[in-house]
């Protein structure tokens, strides 16, 4: 039987709509399980908050009751970020300003590009400075660092050593390449060591190409890189290892990344942070794993992160792409991201979460097909941006008001970060000051009113 083309189109549309609805419902069935949500909520409450007690006394030390205290959170200790790869590189000043606004409105953390191929495309000609020749997605680090300082953004360098995106001129013999890397490490540490205190030292070693000059079955270039870089950077610098999505999230019993990191730490390798990528560069790839693949079920994700947490090092989700392409893609993207961020935020040792490309059409190569930005290409926020804004600036930001008790104390529990405290007595502001509230501790502050 032949069907008119119009009926075939309608049928295709119905099937596509059904598939989208099925994904949304299936995702919720997996992630909205009450026991899982309760565990996530408990983790956030236990690991992301602290307690503060404000004690108000007069000049003689006598406690003052009925004093109004307002606590307003100003910053987060937890690092929420994205890469900063196209800062100032968009088509118009308006788009560049919208990019900055979309970034600073929700983020306090930025990944800066140190890919060797673009930092030193010609041997000896380093692209550190503002005047360096333009390369798309590779603004000079000096420019990015200056912007981070102005906007109180914590910078992170990525990466120092990777088997990919290297200049054509690098040596093909192992010892000569090690010497070239040593020089690279020294130059970067000398210029940025005091200002950039988090670095991905080794990237994606477990998928290293066998054609890479430093490759060996033992991957001994990994401890070598950490041992070379550790003396070059201040002790306060966090030196990280970073690994790809499907490798780093395997169940514990078969997780080669866990085995690698444990072995390196046991041998004394100075790894100080552990990074997990979370890239899905197409809708088909995302649907291959979500919501039913066991590796990316919420219970396995929590088990993997909790097992890595036993190593007592900070954990970071370092690179995230969740696609927004396809019918209903923007809604599905926001739905998935809300659940994933909540899970990540609940893990005790988790210290930061980095989205990858802030805007659509700014990704590397064909990775842009995923439409994995938080905004569209015109920098208009997508539902996923609003979902993160709600989490970071509303759900996970504390503001409270109350009065001191008969002992002159006002207590509150809030998300870790800095707070502005306003003290009002008899409708007159007496003091305003800032406090720092750490995670899982109690801050005791005494305020004296004349």
Language-model features: locations:
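Aromatic-rich peripheral "rim/lid" segments of glycoside hydrolase catalytic domains that contact
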Residues: 29-30, 191, 200-218, 225-228, ...
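Short Pro-Gly-centered beta-turn/loop motif in secreted/extracellular proteins
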Residues: 92-105, 411-418
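Acidic-and-aromatic substrate-binding clefts and catalytic sites of carbohydrate-active enzymes
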Residues: 86-95, 117-122, 127-128, 132-139, ...
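Beta-strand-rich domain onsets/edges
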Residues: 20-65, 70-88, 121-125, 156, ...
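Alpha-helical scaffolding within the catalytic cores
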Residues: 90-101, 139-143, 183-188, 216-229, ...
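Aromatic- and acid-rich polysaccharide-binding/catalytic face
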Residues: 105-117, 185, 192-207, 237-245, ...
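Substrate-binding cleft and catalytic face of glycoside hydrolase catalytic domains
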Residues: 109-125, 138-246
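Bacterial N-terminal signal peptides
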Residues: 6-16
């Amino acid at each position: 039987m032949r069907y008119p083309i119009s009926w075939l189109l309608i049928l295709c549309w119905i099937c596509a709509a059904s598939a989208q609805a099925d994904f949304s419902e299936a995702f919720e069935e997996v992630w909205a399980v009450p026991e899982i949500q309760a565990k996530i909520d408990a983790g956030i409450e236990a690991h992301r908050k602290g307690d503060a007690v404000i004690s108000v006394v007069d000049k003689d030390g006598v406690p003052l009751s009925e004093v109004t205290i307002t606590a307003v959170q100003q910053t987060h200790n937890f690092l929420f970020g994205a890469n900063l790869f196209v800062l100032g590189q968009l088509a118009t000043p308006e788009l560049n300003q919208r990019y900055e606004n979309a970034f600073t409105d929700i983020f306090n953390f930025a990944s800066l590009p140190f890919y060797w191929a673009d930092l030193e495309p010609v041997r000896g000609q380093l692209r550190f400075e503002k005047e360096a020749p333009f390369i798309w997605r590779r603004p000079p680090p000096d420019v990015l660092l200056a912007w981070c300082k102005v906007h109180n953004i914590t910078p992170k360098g990525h990466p120092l050593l990777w088997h990919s995106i290297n200049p054509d001129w690098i040596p093909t013999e192992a010892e000569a390449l090690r010497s070239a890397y040593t020089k690279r490490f020294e130059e970067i540490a000398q210029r940025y060591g005091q200002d950039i205190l988090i670095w991905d030292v080794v990237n994606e070693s477990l998928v290293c190409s066998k054609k890479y000059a430093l490759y060996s079955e033992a991957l001994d270039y990994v401890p070598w890189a950490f041992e070379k870089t550790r003396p070059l950077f201040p002790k306060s610098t966090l030196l990280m290892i970073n690994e790809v999505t499907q490798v780093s999230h395997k169940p514990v019993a078969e997780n080669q990344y866990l085995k690698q990191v444990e072995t390196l730490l046991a041998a004394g390798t100075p790894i100080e942070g552990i990074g997990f990528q979370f890239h899905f560069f197409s809708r088909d790839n995302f649907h291959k794993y979500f919501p039913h693949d066991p590796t990316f079920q919420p219970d396995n994700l929590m088990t993997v992160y909790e097992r890595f947490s036993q190593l007592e090092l900070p954990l970071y989700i370092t690179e995230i792409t969740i696609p927004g392409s396809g019918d209903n893609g923007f809604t599905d993207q926001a739905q998935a991201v809300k659940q994933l961020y909540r899970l990540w935020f609940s893990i005790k040792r988790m210290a930061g979460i980095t989205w990858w490309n802030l805007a659509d059409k700014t990704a590397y190569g064909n990775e842009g097909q995923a439409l994995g930005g938080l905004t569209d290409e015109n920098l208009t926020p997508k539902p996923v941006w609003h979902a993160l804004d709600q989490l970071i600036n509303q759900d996970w930001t504390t503001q409270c008001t109350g009065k001191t008790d008969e002992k002159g104390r006002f207590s509150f529990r809030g998300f870790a970060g800095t707070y502005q405290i306003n003290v009002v007595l008899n409708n007159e502001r007496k003091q305003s000051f800032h406090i720092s509230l750490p995670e899982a501790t109690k801050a005791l502050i005494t305020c004296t009113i004349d």
